[in-house]
């Protein structure tokens, strides 16, 4: 008997909206139907925990997808709990779900159709690709029924007691003419892998398998039999007939069979103690497309008011485009109750952890989670906080093996430093993970904690210097005094170090002191302090004269506390850019010129009063401050200091000319005579060229 029902008004409106709206991402229908099938299997499984008999003759729960090209149908079938007649009427037509209206409002407001299942009305996504849907369902407490509708305002329900269905639901989609791609096994495999790979039940796809089979050539046999009938019967038992072999041929045989598509089971639902290293490696490769095993793994679950499970992996190598600004990040896959939601959830993980790969499966996130409301979702913020915490624990575990951490840091050290720059809450912890070369560490890198343990008695600051390379910094004039006093200096050789040190002021109550900036002081004895004051007084006139010569090129000229063997250096203000930072910013294509002008403050020139050059210069100034040679020497010292301090020469040509003059003086050459000689040569050769040219012209004539 068939009964006809009218759709509830809102359901009718929803179906009309789905059918008449052009929507490109129609593939989500399969995800929704498989998700519903999984829920149905969950329900019967829960019942079987208290009453195993409910599983009856089909204890193995699974989901089947059957494409039928001949009839242009696609069927999604499960042996879950099934639906009674009342369920079919209520769930698929007359009683609007609470999410129906909310989904339509979201859709009309520009929301994504892929959110349909997240409002509890995912079944209706079938009408994105089908113009007619048939649902056959059987519940243990009722006979089987068939629900059918073409989305024309009504649906029918027919009793089918003769059906062979034992239990479950079979949804058959009669596909639209332009949706035949969903009958192709390749396309179906792609969608199942993308959206439903970690559903807890086997998803079996009906596929065609072609095999070659060797069979007797019937045509040859028939011909042979006819020939034998014509021959005399006495020859039927000739020798050799017994050994004659039948001719065979190979034919292709097409069979249909079910093939499990989701072989990678959701490892995160298992106890970490029961998962092997090989299983983690296989799972990592499946979700990341990496060919190498992960360097580190963190499998954890959070329970209580919030419940989610996760597995995080650290790859062995950093991707070549890790810091590309427009790169689409799809490292953390978000699942809600094992249903895939999205793979580029940027709010699930901070930028600096962009190299970590893994999955998060939440039991509490609402299924109506969308990109628009992710940022405001409190549950997601808690998940993010826990992910960061567990990643830090994972890095701690890697750091237990020195060689492993060295390789990890080579690949992801920049990410750790980016975290220090961005993540205020975890900055203190992240500082424990950074490594630097130092004046005492040789070819090995040192931690800040180890540096602090090696600090001299009375040392109050952590001394560091920034630059292009370790080799350059080892011979930098800025570290001379520190080395003379036996103080260790950290070498920061990456551009990101400049940004890190703008955010970090101390470590374990020890202030950071940049040796390339003014205001650096070393612990001095009373005798050293007295000597310093005497040197300042002795160089006062020299400092004043040099400032007058250099003018606006420097802020001031003072006696240095950092130099030991070099004559002079240039330092920047405490809050301005260092020479290395200035170089970095000069290379920025889109730099802010006004900001650069402000931060590239005037430099301070520091003199080493004990250096022979400075002593002789001071003597000359004291004797005659108007000495012409002094001006040239001061500019030459300034330009040389620019180079040794890591700055860019403001006037390379002028510097070269001054160097050339110094060379000529050293060689006792007379510059004027050389120029005259050159001019004389030109004067002598010019007429000869003209004469030669004239004679050749005459020859042509």
Swiss-Prot record:
Region (Disordered): 210-250
PROSITE patterns in UniProt: HSP90 (PS00298)
Keyword Cell inner membrane: no
Stretches with biased composition (Acidic residues): 228-242
Family annotation (SUPFAM superfamilies): ATPase domain of HSP90 chaperone/DNA topoisomerase II/histidine kinase, HSP90 C-terminal domain, Ribosomal protein S5 domain 2-like
Short motif TPR repeat-binding, span: 697-701
Alphabetically ordered keywords of this record: ATP-binding, Chaperone, Cytoplasm, Nucleotide-binding, Stress response
GO terms assigned for molecular function: ATP binding; ATP hydrolysis activity; ATP-dependent protein folding chaperone; unfolded protein binding
Predominant cellular place of this UniProt entry's protein: cytoplasm
Secretion signal, residue range per the UniProt entry: none
Subunit and interaction comment: Homodimer.
Primary role: Molecular chaperone that promotes the maturation, structural maintenance and proper regulation of specific target proteins involved for instance in cell cycle control and signal transduction. Undergoes a functional cycle that is linked to its ATPase activity. This cycle probably induces conformational changes in the client proteins, thereby causing their activation. Interacts dynamically with various co-chaperones that modulate its substrate recognition, ATPase cycle and chaperone function.
Family statement drawn from the similarity comment of this UniProt entry: Belongs to the heat shock protein 90 family.
The protein's name in its UniProt record: Heat shock protein 83-1
Species: Leishmania infantum
């Amino acid at each position: 008997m068939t009964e006809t029902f009218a759709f509830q008004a809102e359901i009718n409106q929803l179906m009309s909206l789905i059918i008449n709206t052009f929507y490109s991402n129609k593939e989500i229908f399969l995800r929704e139907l498989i998700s519903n099938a999984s829920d149905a299997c969950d329900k019967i499984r829960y019942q079987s925990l208290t009453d195993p008999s409910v599983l009856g003759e089909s204890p193995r729960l699974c989901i089947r997808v059957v494409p039928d090209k001949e009839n242009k149908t696609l069927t999604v079938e499960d042996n879950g709990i099934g639906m009674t007649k009342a369920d079919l009427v209520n769930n698929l037509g007359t009683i609007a779900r609470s999410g129906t209206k909310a989904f339509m409002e979201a859709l009309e407001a520009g929301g994504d159709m892929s959110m349909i299942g997240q409002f509890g009305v995912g079944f209706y996504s079938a009408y994105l690709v089908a113009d007619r849907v048939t649902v056959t369902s059987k519940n243990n407490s009722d006979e089987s029924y068939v629900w059918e509708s073409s989305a024309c305002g009504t649906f029918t329900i027919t009793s089918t007691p003769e059906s062979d269905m034992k239990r479950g639901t079979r949804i058959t989609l009669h596909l639209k003419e332009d949706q035949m791609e969903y009958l192709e096994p390749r396309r179906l495999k792609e969608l199942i892998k993308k959206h439903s790979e970690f559903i807890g039940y086997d998803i079996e796809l009906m596929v065609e398998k072609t095999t070659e089979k060797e069979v007797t050539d019937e045509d040859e046999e028939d011909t042979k039999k006819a020939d034998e009938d014509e021959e005399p019967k006495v020859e039927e038992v000739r020798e050799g007939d017994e050994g004659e072999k039948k001719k065979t041929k190979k034919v292709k045989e097409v069979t249909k069979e079910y093939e499990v598509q989701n072989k990678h089971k959701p490892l995160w639902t298992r106890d970490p103690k029961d998962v092997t290293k090989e299983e983690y490696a296989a799972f990592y490769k499946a979700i990341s497309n990496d060919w190498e095993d992960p360097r580190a793994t963190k499998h954890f679950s959070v329970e209580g008011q919030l419940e989610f499970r996760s597995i995080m992996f650290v790859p062995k190598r950093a991707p070549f485009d890790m810091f590309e600004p427009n790169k689409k990040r799809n490292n953390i896959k978000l699942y809600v109750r094992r249903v895939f939601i999205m793979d580029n959830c940027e709010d699930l993980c901070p930028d600096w952890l962009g190299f970590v790969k893994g999955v998060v499966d939440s039991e509490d996130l609402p299924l109506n989670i969308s990109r628009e409301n992710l940022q405001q979702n409190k549950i997601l913020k808690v998940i993010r906080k826990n992910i960061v915490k567990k990643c830090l624990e994972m890095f701690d575990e890697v750091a237990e093996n020195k060689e492993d951490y060295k390789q990890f840091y080579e690949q992801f050290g920049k990410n750790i430093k980016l975290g220090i720059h961005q993540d205020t809450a975890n900055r203190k912890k992240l500082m424990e993970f950074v490594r630097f070369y130092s004046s005492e560490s040789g070819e090995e890198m040192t931690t800040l904690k180890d540096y602090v343990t090696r600090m001299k008695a009375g040392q109050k600051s952590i001394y560091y210097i920034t630059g292009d390379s370790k080799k350059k910094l080892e011979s930098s004039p800025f570290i001379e005094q520190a080395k003379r006093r036996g103080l260790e200096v950290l070498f920061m050789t990456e551009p990101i170090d400049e940004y890190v040190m703008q955010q970090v002021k101390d470590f374990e109550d020890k202030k950071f002191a940049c040796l390339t900036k003014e205001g650096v002081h070393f612990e001095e004895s009373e005798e050293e302090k007295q000597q310093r004051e005497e040197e300042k007084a002795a160089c006062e006139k020299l400092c004043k004269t040099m400032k007058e010569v250099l003018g606006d090129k420097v802020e001031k000229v003072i006696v240095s506390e950092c130099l030991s063997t070099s004559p002079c250096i240039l330092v920047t203000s405490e809050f301005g850019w260092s020479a290395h930072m200035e170089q970095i910013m000069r290379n920025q294509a889109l730099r802010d010129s006004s900001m650069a002008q402000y931060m590239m403050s005037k430099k301070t020139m520091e003199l080493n009063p004990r250096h022979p050059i400075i002593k002789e210069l001071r003597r000359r100034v004291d004797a005659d401050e108007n000495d012409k040679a002094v001006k040239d020497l001061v500019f030459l010292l300034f330009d040389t200091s620019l180079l040794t301090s890591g700055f860019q020469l403001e006037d390379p040509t002028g510097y070269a000319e001054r160097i050339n003059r110094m060379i000529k003086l050293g060689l006792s050459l007379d510059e004027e005579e050389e120029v005259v000689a050159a001019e004389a040569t030109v004067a002598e050769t010019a007429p000869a060229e003209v004469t030669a040219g004239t004679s050749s012209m005459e020859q042509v004539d």
